[in-house]
Amino acid sequence: MNTLTASPQNLTELQECLEIAKKQNLKIAIKAGGNSYSDVFLASNHLIIDISNIDSILSFDSENGFVIVESGVRIGNLLKMIMPKNWGLVGLSGSVTDLIGGMLSSNTHGKDTWKNGNFSKNILSFKLLLANGKIEEVSRQKNIELFNGVVGGLGFLGIVVEITLKLNPIKSFMVKRATKKIYNFGDMIEHFYTLEKSGSDFSYVLLDPFSSTKSLGKGICESSMYVNAPKCTDAQFEEFLYPKRKIGLLKPETFWSTIRPFWGNNTCSLVNKLRFFRSQNNFTKYSVEPFPKIQYGYSALPKFNLLYAPYGFFELQSIFPKENTIHAFTELLAVSNQFKSEPWICMVKRHKPDTSYLTFSGDGLSIAINFPLKSLNSNLREKYCNKLFEIILKFNGKIYLSKHANIPKSIFQKMYPDYKKMSDLKNRYDPDFVFSSDATNRLLVENS
């Protein structure tokens, strides 16, 4: 049997899908925004349930900052409603097409995670459709174990159908943004660990992976903060809350096929050098722009992944304790150079700890490396991944599960020792593995 897909329109239809799947002995994988690079919603001979049509905003208390949403609500639609009322959310990823249910299940993080933590900090409670067909109301107060298992749990335990969020007060939806040069890893560490004094809300560093050994760690830092400033027009605010259909006058397919022959390591190296040259030594120049433009700038470049066609790309994000960061980053970039797979994108963020069992978090810095697969055949790719895993374990790091589909179970268990708690919850709430994606089978099924 081939994989089937269902797109229920409401809770009743969702429950019917669950019952039909159980009667037909089909396992269920859950698809939200479809932005994960992992295999969390992929499955062979399964029923994939797409929750994107269960997308009502049920209530919004604009005075006190509470909102109740169904799990298929798109983040862009929610921000359009709450930000003009001076409310925001924390721990947002860079994809404007993320669904709230998927953000909960991945426990996303963002450029403000150093200050506010992961997306879980917004969550007061949620309703969970269990394998037995019952709906369980979950919160930190009612069931902390299930809360910590479902948040960041990649859909392993059930389907989140409704979420109550506590919003974050903001000065306005306007943000002041500035960049400065980072000359080495020492500069980078100093920047991230003096952020509390800066007044910033958001910050990240883009490293230049093509820099020489002497200037390894060179790059630019961007920091920004909410400000009381004259608001832009509604059209300017909403422009980046929706994925664009064209890049200029061109369809994305045409644009990227035109750019692709001229794009490679040399082009990326040049872009990094120009970006560094144009930046200031200090945060002396800034611009004031609407939050969506800063958060979702990539929405102006739809189907960005087509730049890597036809071979695709590989992304791995790993986090390390502060004291291990420089050595870990140095070795990761050295291995990339050894395999002639320098990342085209190399971003660093600071994080905070989180209590959820499978959440990508901790008191340290993460590095995301994104590189094309054109130069790596399957054999080289496996060797490269194994070397990366070795380095990450060596420096007590862990990998973001939503961005990598090749982590062996043995590596996963070392990086996420709370997997035992997840296994216990799985046996308690879904012993027949009704909810079972390729990721579930790879990471939680015994003898897989």
Regions found by a protein language model. Give the residues of each.
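Noncatalytic alpha-helical scaffold of FAD-dependent oxidoreductases
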Residues: 1-448
